[in-house]
UniProtKB/Swiss-Prot annotation:
Gene: mdh
Active site residues of this protein: 176
Role noted for this protein: Catalyzes the reversible oxidation of malate to oxaloacetate.
InterPro entries linked to this entry: L-lactate/malate_DH, Lactate/malate_DH_C, Lactate/malate_DH_N, Lactate_DH/Glyco_Ohase_4_C, Malate_DH_type3, NAD(P)-bd_dom_sf
Record protein name field: Malate dehydrogenase
Length: 321
């Protein structure tokens, strides 16, 4: 049986980290694509040379030609410009939309049967545009946001409660931006809801509110510290979890930017919701009950995403079809 083929479109910091993780987890052969000559080839060779030490067998091909991704089982898209200090994800819209048009055409031509995971920001608008540019089924084009946002939320909660991250579940809905909605009452430590832990005296509501805000600012915090780029380790790990769920038909419940068509009162939009990911791609969207406060926060988040998608349509009229 042939190994899976995983195409990484964009060979920057996330792309290189993704390639290494694919090797370490033995998920398949890797094609690293980038428009910059030498970068994907150099990173591919460097990672391949770690294989004898780490003990994995996989091919790593660096390329500047979309033809090399032909027949890929999974495409993970990181191509585009990352954030710099002081920038919001939304500031990248015009530049990265043009990149998505090129990437969409490449995937449409060479990997129409792939499961596509988009990481490029502003995430919710870029994955919406990528699906339209590529013409792939909506179930097979998703955005990596919720896994990362939830991971940050879980890490901060684990630090606050001084417990293992493995025992913390965290729930984040909505767009991947300042309006994301971390849901406290659906987040737990070993099954105990966070509001109960507040009542038990483990923490205060004020500290939980601070953690919620830090989660919203999670990406900006790292951008501010790095000063010359954005996060790449945790985003790469998050995308790999999604790819693994698809390749191994794990039916994992993962929050991601999925195409919503009626659920949560939203139509024809990509926004962060809990999903089941298996061999069929996004096989199900889980619709949970929101209270009035949560619903209002979610609607604000959706409105923000709608605004970005409208802006995309103004730049590229073909997206309005």
């Amino acid at each position: 049986m042939a190994r899976h083929k995983i195409a990484l479109i964009g060979s920057g910091m996330i792309g290189g980290t993704l390639a290494h993780l694919v090797g370490l987890k033995e998920l398949g052969d890797v094609v690293l694509f980038d428009i910059a000559e030498g970068i994907p080839q150099g990173k591919g060779l460097d990672i391949a040379e770690s294989a004898p030490v780490e003990g994995f067998d996989a091919k790593f091909l660096g390329t500047n030609d979309y033809a090399a991704i032909e027949g890929a089982d999974v495409c993970i898209v990181t191509a585009g410009v990352p954030r710099k200090p002081g920038m919001s994800r939304d500031d990248l819209l015009g530049i990265n939309l043009k990149v998505m048009e090129q990437v969409g055409a490449g995937i449409k031509k060479y990997a129409p049967n792939a499961f596509v995971i988009c990481i490029t920001n502003p995430l919710d608008a870029m994955v919406w545009a990528l699906q339209k540019f590529s013409g792939l089924p909506k179930s097979h084009v998703v955005g990596m946001a919720g896994v990362l946002d939830s991971a940050r939320f879980r890490y901060f909660l684990a630090e606050e409660f001084k417990v293992s991250v493995e025992d913390v579940t965290g729930f984040v809905l909505g767009g991947h931006g300042d309006s994301m909605v971390p849901l406290i009452r659906y987040s737990t430590v070993a099954g105990i809801p966070i509001p109960d832990l507040v009542k038990m005296g483990w923490t205060t509501q004020e500290k939980i509110d601070q953690i919620v805000q830090r989660t919203r600012d999670g990406g900006a915090e790292i951008v501010g510290l790095l000063k010359s780029g954005s996060a790449f380790y945790a985003p790469a790990s998050s995308a790999i979890a999604m790819a693994e769920a698809y390749l191994k038909d794990k039916k994992r419940v993962l929050p991601c930017a999925a195409h919503v068509s009626g659920q949560y009162g939203v139509k024809d939009l990509y926004v962060g919701v809990p999903t089941v990911i298996g061999a069929g791609g996004v096989e199900r969207i889980i619709e949970i009950d929101l209270n009035k406060t949560e619903q209002k926060m979610f609607e604000n988040s959706v409105a923000s995403v709608e605004g970005l998608c409208k802006a995309c349509g103004d730049i590229a009229p073909s997206l309005k079809n």
